[in-house]
Amino acid sequence: MVLVACGTRPQQPAAHPDWSYNSVVYEMNVRQYTPEGTLAEAARHLPRLQEMGVDVVWLMPVYPIGVKERKGTLGSYYAISDYEAVNPEFGTLEDFDRFLAEAHRLGLRVILDWVANHTSPDARWIEERPADWYVRDSLGNTIVQYDWTDIAKLDYGNADMRAAMAAAMRFWLNRGIDGFRCDMACEVPIDFWQQTLPALRKEYPGIYLLAEGEAPALHDGAFDASYAWELHHLLNDIAQGRKSAADLRAYVARDAAAMPREAFRLMFTSNHDEN
C-alpha cells in the first residue's frame, strides 16, 4: 500500500487534480491479487478497497509480456510487447473497461503503470517499426540496461517514436483512466515529458502523473508527484533505531529546499521494488 501525503495547497495553485490532494494510493499486482489473477476477479475487491479508504488504484503493467529473453516462465510486467493491449493472462480489454467502470462507480481513480524507457526484445514495435526506433550497438543489435536482459531500450532521438509513445498513452486515456505512474522516469529524456505531459493535460484535464524518480527536474512542467525514496528508507532506519528524529527534521528541510513548493511527494510504506 502506498500513501500520497501532500501538505497545504500552494499559494499559486498547481495544475494538480483536486482529488489528488492527500490521496491514498494502493498498488495492485493483478496476477497475485487474487487466486485467479484476473482483472475480473480483482474488480470484485474494489468495494473492499474503497471501505479501507483507498482513493487511487495504481495498476502494475497490464500489457502483454514479451517471450524472447523472458525471465522465468511468467516474465516481467516491465518487458512489454504491446502498449495497446491487455495481457491475456489477465483478461481482455473489455475486462479492463469493466474494472475501470466499477472503480469509477465507487469513486475510485485508476492510474496505469507506464514503461516508456524500453519494450521487450520481441515487441510489436520491433517487428513493425523502423530500426532506428531503438538504441542499437555497432552491429545493429538492440541494447539492454543494467541486468535487464529481457528489454530493448527505445531511442528518444527519433521523433516518430516519441509521437507513437504519446499516442499509446492517449489510447488508455481515451478509455477513461485517470493518469499514469511512469516507470524509471529519469531514464527517459526530461524534454519528452515536458513536451508530452502538458499536451496530454490539455486534452485530458484532471489526469494525475506520478514519476518513479526523485529528481527535482521531474516537476519542471512535467509531473505532479515524484517518489520520496529517501524518506522511505529514513523512516525504516528510524524504526530500527539507526536514525533519529533529528535526521527526519534534516530530511524535511533538505527536501523542501530541493523540490518546488507545488511538488507532490509520494510517501510510501512499501511498493513492488521494496517488498
What are these model-derived regions, one by one?
Residues E27, V56-P61, F180-D183, L210-E212, ...:
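Short beta-strand segments
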